[in-house]
């Protein structure tokens, strides 16, 4: 795991869409993460960390 990935994961825990945006910009992953974060903060975090690590 590189330093950029660690920073993205930390941002994904604090504000999930920001961490995903840094890697995928306005792609499908970002919009899914934003929707999950709006519907429930914890699902947004789980999805963001999953997308960034896998």
UniProtKB/Swiss-Prot annotation:
Q: How does it sit in the membrane?
A: Multi-pass membrane protein
Q: Where are the transmembrane segments?
A: 2-22, 34-54
What keywords would UniProt list here? Membrane, Stress response, Transmembrane, Transmembrane helix
* Upregulating conditions: By cold shock and salt stress, but not by drought or abscisic acid (ABA).
**Which GO CC annotations does the UniProt entry carry?**
membrane
Tissues/organs with expression: Expressed in shoot meristems, mature leaves and roots.
What Pfam families does the entry give?
A: Pmp3
Tell me where in or outside the cell this protein is found. Answer: Membrane
State the similarity comment.
Belongs to the UPF0057 (PMP3) family.
- The molecule here is called Low temperature-induced protein lt101.1
What is the species of this protein?
Answer: Hordeum vulgare
Organism classification, top ranks? Eukaryota, Viridiplantae, Streptophyta, Embryophyta, Tracheophyta
């Amino acid at each position: 795991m590189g330093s950029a990935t660690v920073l993205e994961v930390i941002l994904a825990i604090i504000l999930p869409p920001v961490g995903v945006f840094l890697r995928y910009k306005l792609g499908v992953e970002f919009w899914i993460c934003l929707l999950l974060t709006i519907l429930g903060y914890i699902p947004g975090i789980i999805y963001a960390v999953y997308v960034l690590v896998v």
